[in-house]
Amino acid sequence: PFIPIGRKSIVRAKMAEMVLSEIHNHELDAVICRAPEFYGPDKTQSITNTMFLDKIKEDKTASIPINSSCQRSLIWTPDASRAMVLIANTPSAYNQTWHLPCDKPYSYNELKQIAEKVLNKKVKVRVIREWQFNLIKPFNKSIQELSELLPRYRQDNLFVSDKFKKQFPDFKITTIGEGLSTIL
C-alpha cells in the first residue's frame, strides 16, 4: 500500500494505483520504475544537489536538511536513465515495479568526508533544523514545495534494489565516490 505524505505524493500514489490496476486487469503493459533521491551532473534538481553538492562545488557552506547522521540512498541520474532504458528494452521486465539500482546508503556526514577527500580540502556544512524550515516556509515558495519532502530526512531513508541487481547483474552502478568526483 502507498502511504503518501503531501499533495504531490498523493497524486503520485493515485497514478501508480491506476497503472497497477490496469496492469492487473491486463489492459496495459507497463513498468513502474521507482528511485531514491537523485544526484548527478548538470542541473539535477534534488535537495542533495541544490542544498549540499552545488554549494560545495561553489565553495560555499553546504546545507544539510534536518539530520546529518541519517543514512540516505541516492541514485546517480545517468544510472537511473540507463536502468530505465534497460528495463524498457527487456520484455520480461514488463508488468512489474522495479526499484532502480543505487550505491549503498550514506549519511550527510559521510558525504561530507567523501567530498573532502575528492577535493582534498575541508568542506563547510550546517544543519538546517525542521523548525528553521518551518520559520521560513510562509515567506518562501521553494521551502513550501520542499516541506512535504522533509519527513524523509528525519530518519534513515533506505532503498532496496536487490530485484534489479539480481535480474541485471552486469549493470555497473556508479559509486558515490565516483559520482562526487565527477560533480565536484
PLM regions: where:
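Short, flexible helix-coil linker/hinge segments at the edges of structured domains or between repeats
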Residues: P1-K8, N49-D54
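NAD(P)-dependent short-chain dehydrogenase/reductase
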Residues: N25-I32, P36-Q71
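Residue-level signal for the nucleotide or nucleotide-sugar donor/cofactor binding architecture
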Residues: I10, I75, Y106, F159, ...
